A protein has these predicted regions:
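Ligand/cofactor-recognition surfaces for anionic moieties
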Residues: 2-882
Length: 882
């Protein structure tokens, strides 16, 4: 089986983006040659793959011979000799003498690509771990391969020197690997790999607006000019299949209870049969049908859970560069953005649309969402203007959502004319509602005009290629109440790093800490003595420090701000009497980018740990002090005993588990833990600066009772990216290897900052699985996006598998549902065969691997047989294409 190389999926379509960019370049007068590029995204991607690609399993001698670019060995050696000596030696050590062995023919390095006049389209070279899997265990700072260096040197070198002579390069797809090559975090030297590879070639980088951290990485380490782009279309998940049938049956149950009690036992049995058919008894922790006395409580719980799943915001497709949403997509995106209170001028300026509607009817949206199964008598003013069941808080949410949609559809129909707001509100609700009108007025004057300017994405990409100034703008998640990050098409900036955490983030962080401790107390009856928290730079920038605030709150500290600058100047310890609980020991696994971007925050957290450890408090009031004392008794080194912040080797990035999972060479938790420790066993803090500290990391991790990762946006979820399973799942696997027992794994949800929740990792996985992964709405949306949509399906399966391998969160029934939805559904199967047969093979291969490894413990024999048949058919199809 092949070793697939996956990058994190972009939330845009690079193939279609390239088609649009080609058309815009041609219109602007660029020479695209005599043969025009394909005008279809799938056709372009298929042509690029046919030209060679990087999958050695399917690469043929004919493709190598016909490669667009051929770099003679002597030419490459001349370029290689210009690389600083230290990097040259490291490349020789790992990749041999130039030109190496990767993608070579007859001593030449070959590059797969498509050339259209003065424009060339290439696939970024592979990072190299798939080709050198032993490096996964030992070399997180693996240098680029000869092939990698050659590709960028060929782009840069003039034709007289054997190169293409590019004046600029555009990276399409978020994100690439160039900016993550080893070297300094900023202020790069000549021997830092990104600088050695890219040189002074201008880089223009369309990048999603909600990812300030990774975009900033490209700015800092690859001198990129970012042109930000919009988030994907969003929609409410709704119910489907057995979930929709259950909703109807619950309504029928309420009716027969009131009007025909004799039928109650029959309907109860039908409800339970459907619950079992949908595998919902796992979600609801009910293995047997509740008895008659408890069934009504079970129904309330079920109703509330269905409401929670259907109310999730999911992606309803992928963003297409410069495609301004209109019609139904704009209605859905406006509803998603208006769900959160709006932050304007650094303060909360307007309530969310649903929040304003709820208040107008004497309800509280947060209370409804907190107890969706609660029986309620809804106000007649609400039930008179919108039809639907009206017996529970979940019903109230549905009615309010329906009203919100009618309001937004009404405005969409009238072209968002500002002077129609009051009339639309009165027509839909039957009476004036000033607060609701204010939200719609804001949408008409600020949100929609900014969405209309999404076309700036292409205009400013071309402007950057013309050497023109790309206007700056803020970054963040629009659906978190940040309309000011729109319009897109700007060169985004992030945050003042010394203002982390902000006052608003402190409030959210305290809520996250309180929610986590309350959930653990409810689950176990006690407080956790030690918590492990994963902290990323992107999240810190997007939220202005929610995670940092949570760490401080768990320790029993709080920030001190300068009122004028809003910067954090230090921390203070909260007295135990005010805290009202023990101080929790916190171990933090930071990302490499966080290390680079927030060194002063690392110092702030380190100061907090050391101050709390030095407090004269009883062990049962200060778990951190107790643990530090135990370590001091063992080795006597205070600096080692108080090390609680661990991350990547200086100059390196990542957690290492993605290449390990993709290489398929791991066998047990010991392998997962080994890579996690090799890639993350470096201590940070005052006087540490990335000191190798594996033993101290393992000692700290062995105490972790709770492993936490927070999720601050619904624009993506925990199986949308490999980083979640690498960092969070990796932490779980590490603790399990060290102790023999998995820690409690939780996900903090602050996507709505005013309504923070904590779920177990299993609960969050099932919620995402039902709301998005096997939701026909999402699958159909991906089918609209061809090759890239199919890639998203395959990536989702990969990331679920990765989380299962590390944290054990995928049940057998979930694998069965994946196979049924992605491979056995005729429409989706045909889509994969036509648009991306490589994704079809990859999905099948991954599911078979899950069964082979016992992660999918007891697959149905018929399912396995169909998977094997699918795999063989897919192999044959791909062989026919070669």
């Amino acid at each position: 089986r092949s070793r697939r190389r996956r990058r994190r999926p972009a939330r845009a379509r690079p193939g279609v983006a390239a088609v649009r960019l080609f058309a815009a370049l041609a219109e602007a007068g660029y020479d695209l040659g005599d043969t025009p590029p394909p005008d279809d995204g799938d056709a372009l991607i298929h042509a690029l793959i046919a030209a060679g690609g990087h999958d050695v399993e399917w690469l043929t001698p004919e493709q190598l011979a016909a490669a667009e670019a051929r770099i003679p060995g002597a030419t490459y050696r001349r370029w290689f000799d210009q690389v600083p000596a230290e990097l040259r030696e490291r490349m020789r050590e790992h990749w041999g003498e130039p030109p190496g062995e990767l993608y070579t023919e007859g001593g030449d390095i070959v590059l797969a690509g498509l050339r259209f006049g003065n424009v060339v389209l290439l696939i970024q070279p592979p990072r190299g771990f798939g080709e050198n899997p032993i490096a996964i265990y030992h070399d997180p700072d693996l240098p680029p391969s000869h092939h990698y260096l050659a590709a960028y040197r060929w782009l840069t070198a003039p034709a007289a020197d054997g190169g293409f002579g590019a004046d600029a390069v555009v990276h399409l797809g978020k994100h690439g690997t160039l900016e993550w090559l080893p070297g300094k975090g900023l202020g790069l030297a000549a021997d830092c790999a990104p600088d050695a590879v890219l040189g002074d070639l201008p880089l223009v980088y369309p990048f999603i607006v909600n990812d300030p951290g990774e975009g900033t990485q490209a700015k800092r380490r690859a001198h990129a000019v970012v042109v930000d782009h919009l988030v994907p279309p969003m929609a409410r998940a709704e119910t489907y299949g057995d979930l929709a049938k259950l909703e109807q049956l619950l309504d029928e149950y309420a009716t027969v209870q009131a009007l025909d009690p004799a039928k109650v036992p029959t309907v109860r049995a039908q409800i339970w049969d459907l619950v079992r058919a949908a595998e919902l008894h796992h979600d609801l922790h009910a293995e047997a049908m509740p008895d008659a006395d408890d069934f009504d409580d079970f129904v309330l719980h079920l109703d509330g859970y269905l409401c929670e799943v259907k109310d999730v915001q999911i992606r309803d497709g992928l963003h297409i560069l410069a495609d301004a949403p209109t019609g139904e997509p704009r209605v859905n995106l406006v509803l998603a953005v208006l769900r959160a209170p709006q932050i304007w001028g650094g303060a909360r300026a307007l309530p969310g649309l649903r929040q304003a509607l709820a208040v107008a009817y004497g309800l509280d949206e947060q209370e409804l969402l907190a107890a969706p199964g609660q029986r309620l008598t809804l106000p007649a003013a609400l039930t008179d203007v919108v039809d639907g069941p009206a017996g529970t808080a979940a019903d109230a949410i549905d009615l309010i959502e329906a009203l919100a949609r009618r309001l937004v559809v009404g405005m969409e129909t009238l072209g968002w004319a500002v002077d129609t707001v009051d009339a639309v509100v009165t027509e839909v609700t039957g009476r004036p509602m000033p607060d609701v009108a204010a939200v719609l007025h804001f949408a008409a004057t600020e949100l929609v005009p900014r969405l209309d300017r999404t076309t700036d994405e292409l205009t400013n990409t071309l402007g950057a290629l013309d050497g023109r100034f790309v206007p700056p703008g803020p970054s963040g998640s629009p659906t978190r109440g940040l309309v000011n990050v729109l319009p897109t098409g700007r060169n985004f900036y992030s945050v003042d790093p010394k203002a982390i955490p902000s006052r608003n983030a402190w409030d959210v962080g305290v809520a996250l800490a309180d929610s986590l401790l309350a959930r653990h107390l409810a689950d176990t009856g006690g407080y956790p003595r030690s918590v492990g928290l994963t902290v990323w730079g992107t999240s810190a920038m997007r939220t202005q420090g929610d995670d940092i605030a949570e760490v401080l709150a768990l320790l029993g500290c709080r920030p001190v701000w300068d009122d004028r600058s809003r910067r954090v100047t230090g921390i203070e310890v909260v007295p135990t009497a005010e805290l009202g609980r023990p101080r929790v020991d916190v171990t933090v696994r930071i990302s490499g980018f966080f290390r680079d971007a927030f060194p002063h925050v690392v110092a702030l957290l380190d100061d907090a740990v050391r101050r709390v450890a030095a407090l004269d408090e009883p062990d049962e009031e200060n778990y951190l002090r107790a643990h530090v004392a135990a370590d001091l008794a063992e080795h006597g080194d205070e600096r080692r005993a108080t090390a609680r912040i661990f991350g990547s080797k200086p100059g390196a990035y990542g957690a290492g588990l993605l290449p390990l999972i993709d290489a398929r060479t791991w066998r047990s938790d010991a392998d997962l833990a080994e890579v996690y420790a090799v890639w993350g066993g470096y201590a940070y803090g005052r006087g540490l600066d990335g000191r190798e500290a594996r033993a101290d990391m393992e000692r700290s991790f062995a105490r972790i009772a709770v492993a936490v990762k927070n999720q601050d946006t619904r624009e993506h979820d925990i199986v949308d990216s490999d980083d979640y399973f690498q960092y969070h799942g990796g932490m779980v696997a590490m603790v399990r290897h060290l102790t023999g027992t998995s820690p409690q794994a939780y996900v903090g949800d602050s996507a709505m900052p005013h309504d923070v929740r904590t779920r177990t990792l299993g609960e969050e996985t099932r919620r995402v699985f039902r709301a998005r992964v096997v939701n026909p709405k999402w699958i159909a949306a991906m089918r609209r996006h061809g090759y890239k949509g199919a890639f998203e399906l395959a990536a989702t399966v990969d990331y679920l598998f990765g989380y299962d391998a590390t944290a054990g969160v995928v049940d057998d029934w979930m694998y069965e549902h994946l196979a049924a939805a992605y491979l056995f559904d005729e429409t989706t199967r045909e889509f994969l065969e036509q648009s991306n047969p490589w994704a079809l093979r990859g999905i099948t291969e991954r599911l078979l691997e899950a069964a082979d490894r016992g992660l999918w413990a007891k697959p149905e024999p018929a399912t396995l047989d169909r998977l094997r048949d699918t795999y063989l058919a897919s192999e044959g199809d791909l062989e026919d294409r070669v």
